[in-house]
Amino acid sequence: MKKFHGLILTALVTCLIIPFSLAASAETNENGNNSTPTEEKTTDTTENIITEEKTEPAEPTKDTTVTPPQKSKVQTTIDITDSQEVYSYEQNSKIDLKDFTATLTDYTDTKLTNYRLAANSKLSTAQTGIQEVTLLGDNEDGKTTAVKLNYLVKEKTAQLTITDMNFDLETKIFTGKTKPFASVYMSSPADENFGEGTTTADKDGYFYAEWATTPKQITAYAFDESGNYSEEVTYQVPAKKQNEAVVTAPDKVKKIETKNAVKSATTKPTDVTKVTKDDKTDLPSTGDKGTEWIFVVAGVIVILVAVLLLRKRKK
């Protein structure tokens, strides 16, 4: 019985202790749960705030990066057409893309590579005046940049000259000097002595031409196979020999016929001969008329003689 009462007492004490221990543990759990969520919430809030601050400035930076392409579009064409004397050429002279690209950086302040002609652009010196052309090149970023420029085409100046002109009144040989092996065209005024022809200068540049008659003046200009030429010069042929210079011409000299020389040498003698033949053919008829008059006179004389003889017989 004593053991039984002891067990009951132990059970009662245990029942009294368990509620108090459960209550204490409950308070401890409540305090721990309240502090932990607060820290998590605080941490989460801080992280959200930091994330929002980073994302908001990032959007304006993206907007600012859009502007550089707009600036590059404005600068894709470089116009230097206001410098018309930068490049100049003579008419019909050679022109090449390298003529521009070699020094183009000095005028554009922009280094470009892989130069080429833009569409509908060409290089030509056929027409005089200011010509406009557009070139394309690649910058350091690989983007295409257009360079708009112009060049001046001037009228070609004479490269050859004709000097030492002389006309020998005795031999009628016209001489002068120009570039060796150049061609020389010469002509006289368009009158009765008009003549024209082309001769070639020798290895020393001297040229010779023999005229059929003596013209009043001779106009000449020289040109070569490269397209060079001289100014047109006019030589006034003197009426009398003005110097004692002796012209030593080669054996074969270009002969220039004139209209007057052709007529006097061929047409006129032929006409005279024809007229003479025609006159001779007419002479027989004129001779016949002369012979008739002789017979008439002879008949009159015979009649007079017969009359005289008849009178003598009557006496």
UniProtKB/Swiss-Prot annotation:
Highest taxon of the lineage: Bacteria
Prosegment residue ranges: 287-315
Induction trigger: Present in both exponential and stationary phase (at protein level).
Protein name as it appears in the record: Cell wall protein Lmo2714
Residues making up the signal peptide according to the UniProt record: 1-26
Coiled-coil zones: none
Record carries keyword Signal: yes
Composition bias type Polar residues, residue spans: 66-76
Short sequence motif named LPXTG sorting signal, residue ranges: 283-287
One Pfam match: Gram_pos_anchor
Primary localization: secreted
Source organism per UniProt: Listeria monocytogenes serovar 1/2a (strain ATCC BAA-679 / EGD-e)
Localisation per UniProt entry: Secreted, Cell wall
Region called Disordered, residue ranges: 27-76
Gene Ontology CC terms, in alphabetical order: extracellular region
PROSITE patterns documented for this protein: GRAM_POS_ANCHORING
Bias (Basic and acidic residues): 51-62
Keywords: Cell wall, Peptidoglycan-anchor, Secreted, Signal
Modified residues annotated as Pentaglycyl murein peptidoglycan amidated threonine in this record: T286
Membrane-protein topology: Peptidoglycan-anchor
